[in-house]
A protein has these predicted regions:
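Short, ordered loop/turn segments at secondary-structure junctions
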Residues: 90-92, 122, 150, 179-180, ...
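Divalent metal-coordination and catalytic microenvironments
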Residues: 6, 19, 24, 45, ...
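Histidine/acidic residue-rich metal-binding segments in metalloenzymes
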Residues: 129-305
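A glycine-rich helix N-cap at a beta->alpha junction
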Residues: 108-122
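Histidine-rich, glycine-flanked metal-binding segment
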Residues: 1-51
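Metal-associated gating/positioning segment near the N- to mid-region
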Residues: 44-112, 129
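His/Asp/Glu-enriched, well-ordered alpha-helical/loop segment
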Residues: 197-227, 298-299, 303-305, 311-391
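C-terminal cap of metal-dependent C-N hydrolases
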Residues: 6, 319, 323, 378-444
Length: 446
């Protein structure tokens, strides 16, 4: 296959060059390449970017209620949105299960994937078998795992120290959900006792300080241990970003992720008639938090924009319509992210380098994919997204998530996704809303 005449996003610039693809790989990049009996895609006037990577999704998750999206529908939505690789966070397994239990289950789910995929391990408890379990995950091709500071299997400071020591020895990334559980439970319990159960109290029960305290503690523990691969997921607040900026200015090494929703949506959504659909954790915040996140993107303190895609139907979300504590937490977003972020390049709010770093380069580098994915270079997988500059609006009726709605419905974008190429195969023709069902996702060892 030869992609001709496209405007190609290369590291920090856009060049009009051709891309030759053979046997799933990019084999040549240059101006006016000879055709050599190749299948030709003339992409004049269109932009070509590397396939985006979403390192934070939750498909097939069971939180007492099953998510709307299984692995097939979730990865299909990802692919239609120009995300060609996901790294999924499995849910918790039964109490006492080993570290491989949920990964093995998800390996089976992955066989239905439309795009390429990998997994993070999920660490629930720590015991004499944990180190061997982490080593087993690494042998399966997983170089990362997640721990939580809240929810059922929250970790103590002592356990965090031990996890960081193990991860340092094994050269693994630890992704952490950073919220102080004691503070949340105190606030939420008081609100529920007082009958303050409107949706806005979900946000009030998880203020920015809840996140900032946990973030500061994690950074300090990692620094004490000499661990430099802490990955802070879905950072949402100015308070947390202030702690992060101070630590980064001191030379401390760790990674920071935010999500599309925290860059665009604020907590005024919790006063709207459909407020329940915006319930997620951390919650949506205020405009000053949004401004802080964008400022820290520009300063380089934020490494990744992911989605934390965790979708539930409105039927399930409405179980919490009169009591926020009964609402399943999570929103869809895996299809919307890449289009929204690329639009910021056309709107000149992001440079080419900033966009590529946030959605492709840094996710690939941090999680061990960069030898194959994350940029348009000879020798890498031919994962490519073709954009057409065009003023448009996101329409939830056209999206592939089984949630049936989008928190970005009606959102203005400056492009549409024309085609998606997965490992050299034309997987999506968005102009025809068509997917090549013969193309299957592959597990990518890291």
């Amino acid at each position: 296959m030869l992609l001709k005449n496209g405007m190609v996003l290369l590291k920090d610039r856009i060049e009009c060059v051709d891309i030759r693809v053979k046997e799933e790989k990019i084999v040549e990049i240059g101006a006016k390449l000879s055709e050599n009996n190749d299948e030709i895609l003339d992409l004049k006037g269109l932009y070509i970017a590397p396939g985006a990577i979403d390192v934070h999704t939750h498909f097939n998750i069971n939180v007492g209620i099953f998510s709307a999206d299984d692995f097939k529908s979730g990865t299909t939505a990802a692919l239609f949105g120009g995300t060609t690789t996901v790294i999924d966070h499995p849910g918790f397994g039964p109490k006492g299960c080993n570290l491989e239990y949920m990964v093995d289950k998800y390996m089976e789910y992955g066989k239905t994937a439309a795009c390429d995929y990998s997994f993070h391990g999920v660490a629930q408890e720590i015991d004499e078998h944990t180190f061997d379990g982490l080593r087993a995950l690494k042998a399966k091709g997983l170089n990362s795992f997640k721990i939580y500071l809240t929810y059922t299997y929250k970790q103590t400071d002592k356990e965090i120290v031990e996890f960081f020591k193990m991860a340092k020895e094994l050269d693994m990334v630890v992704a952490v959900h950073a919220e102080n559980d004691t503070m949340i439970e105190e606030l939420r319990g008081n609100f529920v006792k007082e009958g303050k159960t409107d949706i806005i109290y979900h946000a009030y029960s998880r203020p920015g300080d809840v996140e900032a305290e946990a973030v500061a503690r994690l950074i300090k523990i990692a620094h004490m241990v000499g661990y430099e691969k802490l990955y802070l997921v879905h950072i949402s607040s100015k308070e947390a970003m202030d702690e992060i900026a101070i630590a980064k200015s001191q030379g401390k090494k760790f990674f920071v992720e935010t999500c599309t929703q925290y860059l665009y949506l604020d907590n005024t959504k919790y006063f709207e008639a459909d407020a329940v659909k915006y319930v997620l954790s951390p919650p949506l915040r205020e405009q000053e938090d949004i401004e802080s996140l964008w400022y820290n993107i520009k300063t380089g303190n934020i490494d990744v924009v992911a989605t934390d895609h965790c979708s539930f139907t409105m039927e399930d979300k409405n179980k919490g319509v009169s009591d926020f504590s009964k609402c399943p937490n999570g929103i869809p977003g895996v299809e919307e992210r890449n289009l929204i972020m690329f639009s910021e390049v056309l709107n000149k709010n992001l440079t080419v380098k900033e966009y590529l770093d946030l959605v492709a380069v840094n996710p690939a580098k941090i999680f061990g994919l960069y030898n194959r994915k994350g940029s348009i270079e000879v020798g890498k997988d031919a994962d490519l997204v073709v954009f057409k500059a065009e003023n448009n609006k996101i329409d939830e009726k056209n999206l592939k998530s089984k949630a049936g709605y989008s928190c970005f419905n009606g959102f203005n974008v400056s492009a549409v996704i024309d085609k998606v190429i997965l490992r050299g195969n034309l997987a999506i023709d968005n102009t025809a809303q068509k997917i090549n069902s013969q193309i299957k996702g592959k597990f990518i060892a890291r």
